[in-house]
Structures are given as C-alpha cells and as structure tokens.
C-alpha cells in the first residue's frame, strides 16, 4: 500500500470508527456462559473477531448475523470439536479460550497464524497447569498450536507478575469451573472490560476498591444473557485523532467512542504534550461512552513511564507523535511491546529511522528525537496491524509505502476507506 502526502486540511465528524475489539471478543466468548440468546449491535466485523465467532460456532453455538448485529444462542453443552479452533492473529481470542476451555470436558486444539503461533502463551498455560489443567504445546506449552484436555480445576490464589487483561480474564474464566472460591490479583490495574461485562451478567465476582484484586466463585447457574450496543474502539480512533493533530488547520470529531479510564491513557498523553483534545462523556452504561474532539496542535516532547498497560496498543502511534513533537520523548517500562504482534520496540525504531527520524531502542521502550526532517520511505509492518496504521498516518505528511498492509483488516476493516474519505490518495 502506498500513501501520498495529503495537501489539504481535514475537517470531519467520524461515526464509523471500528467497533471495540476487546468488547466484541468478550461478548462472543462470555455468551457461552449463558443459556439464552445474546445480542450485540455494532459487533466488530474484522478478521480477528469473526474468527472468534467461528470458534464458538465450532463449540456448538448458533449464530445469526445481519450486518453488524450478531445474535448468539449458546449450546446446552460445549462440544468437543472435530476441527482446529483457529484464532487467526488474535492473542486475546487464544488466551481467553485457553482459560475457558481448561475446565471444560473435551479435547480442544487452538492455533493461529504464523505470528500468533510465535507469541508467548506460558503466562496463561503455566498457572492453569498448576491448578490441574492439561495443556500441551511447543516449548512447554508456551507456543501454539496448543492442545487442551479439559479437567476438573482446583481453586487458586494467583498473584500475576504482569499487568494483563488477557491473563486476568483467562484466570477468571477458569475460576468459574474450579472446585472452590478463587482469588486473583495483579501488580497494576489492567483493562477491566471483563469485570464490567461479567458484573452486568450477574457473575459471582467481587472486585476490590482499587480494582487490583478479585474473588471469583464457581458458577452454580448460567449467567444473564447480554443485549448490548458495542461502542467504537478508542485504540482505532486514536489514529484519526493523531491525524487531526499533525495535519495543519484540521479538526476531527470522533463519535460513540469507548471512554473507559483504562483505555484513554494515550489521549491524556497527547493532552500533556500540548494537543487540543477534549473528551466528553455522553453515556454511562456497563461502559463509559462519549466523543473526542481534536484539532491541529503543536506537540512537545514527553517522558512516559506510568500506566503502560493502558496504552500498549497505542504505543506505535504515540511513537509517531513523539517523532513530530518538539524535543526528545521516551517511553519506558513497556517491555510487553516486544511480545505483541511484532516486536513493536524494534520495528518502530527501525521504520522511523527509514523515515529520517532519530530513534533509539531501549530494553523496555524507545527514545525519539522530534522535529527531524521526514522523508518518504518504504517500511515493513511485519504483519502488525498497529504498525501499518501508525505509519499510514505518518504517510499523510511525507508519503509512505507499507509492506504487508493487509494485516489492517484484522482489527479495522474500514480504515483505508475512512482515510480515503478524508482526502488521502492511496494505491492499494
């Protein structure tokens, strides 16, 4: 894909940002904990979340879909499928399904694409194995494909050494099948969509005031079925917020955006850098929803070291903001970036250098000198949708060619369409 420099300002109201990926995955998987029809409007129709629907279909669920309205009727009993459960590129789908299936009677095989099958799964498989799960795979069940033989699970008191909503949710799902009350805690607060959704479904889960500790009881009855409207994804919206900031005389209003406090940290970073950015809450249901208004702004350098789990998906796009800011910026305490869809630390630094930016790898982040003269270049996405979309936005300033841009479809299928509608010239 080649993106040409955009010569005109942008002034737009965007209501068609991709639906939230985290909530879409959870809606589909959590429907298996109910016994009645579940309904979601504005379900994300991207490769990752469509794969999740296919997985639960192979486990016995019936699915009706009309455009982005999805109805799921769960099976009376989870089937042991005669096929591999394909998670595609989604670490969320694989890790949550490991936790869900560990306590289900049956034999299950989870696999993904070449990128997912090289991402670490021991953070899930190890604690589950310790409570009786049988999980087999390469490198001591660290790499998919993974085989899961469902077992009766023991109660646990698990203290996670990493802040990960995927680990947390996998352990919650396994706790529902354990033989007694379970406890989970993490070192810092990760995304809390699972807790919010499960509480709305009347799950037997208690959350401490600081959100760091959970008490989960085994399920004694099916959970309440869901009927929700999924808000738009703040991580996907972030690319267009960034576009409004870096393009002269531009303004973008982003509508129906999820404003969960654990998902807007990157926007707060932009505000601290000097961005003219306002967030307004319009609705409070099981999640906080609102709009984001962004205008062209001059940015200043910044050091980012806190709440990293809350901006891990936006880090590549933040690196673009760093490159366009005045002065030096850095992101640290972000070693998790090395085990995402790509090694995002190495890949961002490599590609920024190709575009004329002074950038340096740190063990747990990167350091970027802003204000360098940009040059048009060809960059590699390494199959990482967030790398591809971040450099697509930079391409609006300097022109850019992106290798393997099809990965964008895993999370944001209409990204190119929106970019084109804003006036960008794209050879795709």
Swiss-Prot record:
GO cellular component, one term: cytoplasm
Alphabetically ordered keywords of this record: Amino-acid biosynthesis, Aromatic amino acid biosynthesis, Cytoplasm, Transferase
Binding site for phosphoenolpyruvate: 21, 91, 119, 166, 344, 386
Keyword Transferase belongs to the record: yes
Pathway(s) of this molecule: Metabolic intermediate biosynthesis; chorismate biosynthesis; chorismate from D-erythrose 4-phosphate and phosphoenolpyruvate: step 6/7
Enzyme nomenclature, EC number: 2.5.1.19
Location in or out of the cell: Cytoplasm
Location, primary (coarse class): cytoplasm
Domain of life according to the entry: Bacteria
Enzyme class: transferase
Function field: Catalyzes the transfer of the enolpyruvyl moiety of phosphoenolpyruvate (PEP) to the 5-hydroxyl of shikimate-3-phosphate (S3P) to produce enolpyruvyl shikimate-3-phosphate and inorganic phosphate.
Quaternary assembly: Monomer.
Record's protein name: 3-phosphoshikimate 1-carboxyvinyltransferase
Upper lineage: Bacteria, Pseudomonadati, Campylobacterota, Epsilonproteobacteria, Campylobacterales
